Regions:
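Beta-strand-enriched cores of mature, soluble protein domains
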Residues: 2-149
């Protein structure tokens, strides 16, 4: 039996994360979508800049999130994200679970997959990455990405 929160289990979880491969910051805008099954739904557009695989990049994405019966959020970016660099572009798809924050923002944790032919971003092809996506109540976003070992 594994007890969540034990020091030994925490060390095991940390070892599952590989190298940090991306850090982005930027802004978001939200749009309310028609409710699904009586629960709120949202669409978010994000524009960020940062580094991915050591390369300066710009990113744009649109994702949707639906509130679940327990108040949590499930979000998807179904191949509607793009990362641009000086030698090409990458597209990405992502899914994640999240929750609203006290200041009116949201935080998500999930998986992201990149596809590219840009030479500078080839290191992200064919890998499952995990991420933290945090947005404050003013729409300021931070996206951190790690390889999943």
């Amino acid at each position: 039996m594994i007890r969540v929160g034990t020091k030994k289990n925490l060390l095991k979880r940390r070892n599952m994360l590989g190298e940090k491969v991306g850090t982005f910051t930027g802004t978001t805008t939200d749009k309310v979508l028609p409710a699904q099954g009586g629960f709120p739904a949202f669409e978010t557009s994000a524009q960020t800049t940062g580094k991915l695989a050591g390369v300066d990049v710009q990113s744009m994405a649109t994702y949707s999130a639906q509130m679940q019966p327990d108040g949590s959020l499930y979000g998807e970016c179904p191949n509607s994200g793009v990362v641009m660099t000086s030698d090409g572009a990458a597209t990405f798809r992502a899914t994640g679970c999240g929750q609203m924050t006290a200041d009116g923002g949201a935080k998500f944790r999930g998986a992201v997959y990149f596809q590219t032919s840009a030479p500078s971003l080839m290191a992200v092809n064919g890998k499952c990455m995990v991420y933290e996506w945090d947005v404050d109540g003013q729409g300021n976003a931070t996206w951190n990405i790690w390889e999943w070992a």
